[in-house]
Amino acid sequence: MIRRMIHRMKPRVMASAFAILLIWVSAAQAVCNDIYVDLRGPWGQARFAVEIADTDALRAQGLMHRERLARSAGMLFIYDAPTEPSFWMRNTLIPLDMVFVDPTGRITRVHANAIPHDTTPIPGGPNVLMVLEINGGMAALLGIAEGSELRHPRLNQRQAVWPCE
């Protein structure tokens, strides 16, 4: 009788174990997803839902003509190779913080509260692979600063200071 009970339980146990494994794998994949960037530093952690700008056309358009940006949203500019980018705010209607990121995911510079419509160049400095644009003032509010770390699957995970899990 006990053998029968154990035999009947095996499929249920296996199904439960498989379901738990699927949930665990899904959760692990959700940790690092192309539509999010995670940032961390001594101040804590933050996550932003991002649109990706990884072509010349998308990078040129950026966040121009947007009347608002959700508090936890941004745009992630991704370059094919490290570069020395320069941004401006022409046709940009909202103030933005620009977070410049090196190939390891380390933040090298934060330009706070870029002024809407200002055509003054905003240099990112050398060795920039990504730039995260978020609402103006958000970096200061959260504590995002030079030395903070960004996690995203498009970084080379072997070089990343905070690799995807």
Regions found by a protein language model. Name each.
Residues 2-17:
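Bacterial N-terminal signal peptides that target proteins for export
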